[in-house]
Design a protein with these regions (language model features):
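Short alpha-helical transmembrane segments in multi-pass integral membrane proteins
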Residues: 1-28, 87-152, 196-252, 308-373, ...
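Residue-level signal for short hydrophobic patches within transmembrane helices
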Residues: 17, 21-40, 44, 68-75, ...
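Transmembrane helical elements of multi-pass membrane transporters/channels
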Residues: 26-45, 148, 159, 182, ...
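Transmembrane alpha-helix boundary and packing residues in multipass membrane permease domains
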Residues: 31, 35, 47, 85, ...
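Helix-terminus/linker motif at the lipid-water interface of multi-pass membrane proteins
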Residues: 36, 40-59, 129-136, 192-199, ...
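Small-residue hotspots at the loop-to-helix junctions and early N-terminal turns
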Residues: 53-67, 142, 146, 205, ...
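Small-residue-rich hydrophobic transmembrane alpha-helices
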Residues: 58-119, 156-175, 282-346, 377-400
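Short runs within selected transmembrane alpha-helices of multi-pass transporters and secretion channels
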Residues: 80, 148-167, 175-183, 204-219, ...
Length: 453
């Protein structure tokens, strides 16, 4: 039995030891492939409804509905990052007692939150769609999709919480295996429900929730079978106020940051909705296409958060600082490669989603206008992830909410109202990123732990 435990431990990346760039890549690639399959998982819905149902269904799944899901679920995912940071620090410090308390407190908190998030999403879906000025022909399918999605919120939140716990201890492989399985299952169910049984948006929503249920069950089973200190044991699931406080201290700012991001995106969606169904469909599809860039950037951000968290817990400040520099270089190399590919193949990529040439033309213009500025965000993503791993979350949240979210909203009402059009809307992204990136760099060099050493 002891031998099995040791074998299990060797499967977990030793983040506090070894060559930094190699250890970062060992941890990064499973997250990258995981986010890739997550993107394929999400994109399958859009491709199927776009090609086999119509542009109204495409707008329903990929437009305002996507924004609402990101707003409500994104807040909880931010809270999950709090659990991830706390557990990674305890794991790095080999504090077994507090790690167990944080893990089991996080799980019961997840159960309680799923009830609140699911209920709120179900009730508020239609009013928010109207508030966002969603085109009338899109609203019925959007409401149907959101009601089914939020009815299955429990599975989505459980998967996100357990996956964040596994990554916190350096296990980025098993969440990847789960995503591969559920991604293939989602594509199969999309084809069966939509192409064969002609269930439209209803079929896409049912396929999504079914796969979320499978993913939640699988990752929970992995955590229950773990032969290490992070094993989930149902009889130990209870609230520990100190652990909950530590999780919320880090998770709440991250959750609020996510909410502010999505409020800004919701506001942008309102302005986009005023430009008609073709632009709404193109913008929603753009969100699926540029997610290829975000999955790379976010994979590096998740990697550096866990990397900094464990080394911070172990007191290895020099290694922690060096890892940020290494991660930044790798993230920029990847960002330039992905951005170039998206710009070069913009037209054929859009044709994968829809045969409507008007939508394709609008979408290709969006990619070529906006994608070149995405590299600016890399600074924000990596530094924010590093600061979060060290437990520094309040000021980064303020910088993000003010520099990105608030400034973007001000731009929309101050500039876009007098200069209407999709180009004016998209310009809010690089303007807000440049200002926020400068603020993050200044804060990092002044306040990151160990910079004075």
């Amino acid at each position: 039995m002891k031998q099995n435990k040791n074998q299990k431990n060797t499967a977990v990346n030793q983040i506090t030891e070894g060559v930094i760039w190699k250890q970062l890549l060992i941890f990064f690639f499973p997250i990258l492939f995981g986010t890739l399959f997550q993107q394929i998982y999400n994109t399958a819905d859009t491709v199927v409804v776009g090609r086999f149902v119509g542009k109204e269904a495409l707008a329903a799944v990929g437009g305002s509905s996507s924004m609402i899901v990101n707003l409500i679920v994104g807040f909880f995912v931010g809270l999950c990052s709090g659990a991830s940071v706390v557990i990674s620090q305890f794991y790095g410090a080999k504090d077994h007692k507090n790690l167990k308390k944080a893990l089991h407190t996080s799980m019961i908190f997840c159960l309680a939150a799923s009830i609140i998030v699911g209920t709120a999403g179900f009730i508020l879906a239609e009013p928010i769609l109207h508030l966002m000025k969603t085109p009338a022909e899109v609203i019925p399918d959007s409401v149907l999709y959101l009601h089914i999605y939020f009815a299955g919120t429990f599975f989505n939140l459980v998967y996100n919480m357990v996956s964040s716990i596994l990554r916190a201890v350096g296990d980025s492989k098993r969440p990847l295996y789960v995503l591969i399985i559920t991604c293939l299952l989602n594509i199969l169910l999309d084809v069966v429900f939509v192409v064969i049984f002609h269930m439209g948006v209803l079929g896409v929503a049912l396929a999504t929730v079914s796969c979320q249920a499978v993913s939640a069950i699988l990752v929970t089973w992995f955590l229950m079978r773990a032969e290490d200190i992070y094993r989930l044991e149902f009889h130990e699931i209870r609230f520990d106020l100190r652990s909950l406080g530590a999780v919320l201290r880090i998770g709440l700012p991250a959750g609020l940051e996510s909410v502010m991001y999505n409020i800004a995106n919701l506001t942008i969606q309102i302005f986009v909705n005023e430009l008609g169904t073709d632009t709404v469909a193109a913008w929603g599809t753009m969100g699926k296409i540029d997610a290829v860039f975000w999955m790379v950037c976010n994979a590096f951000a998740i990697s550096i958060t866990t990397f900094v968290g464990q080394n911070y817990g172990a007191g290895k400040y020099h290694r922690m600082r060096k890892s940020v520099r290494v991660c930044m270089v790798m993230a920029y190399i990847s960002a330039f490669i992905v951005s170039g590919a998206l710009i070069l193949f913009a037209n054929p990529i859009y044709h994968l989603f829809t045969t409507d040439q008007v939508v394709v033309d609008i979408g290709v213009h969006m990619i070529r206008f906006l994608i070149p500025s995405y590299a600016i965000y890399v600074v924000i993503g990596i530094i924010s992830g590093a600061l979060r791993g060290a437990g520094r979350v309040l000021v980064p949240m303020i910088l993000t909410c003010g520099g990105v979210c608030l400034l973007r909203i001000i731009w929309l009402f101050a500039f876009v109202r007098s200069h209407p059009g999709i180009d004016s809307i998209m310009l809010s992204y690089p303007v807000s990123w440049i200002i926020t990136a400068v603020l993050f760099v200044i804060y990092y060099f002044r306040r990151f732990p160990g910079m004075q050493l």
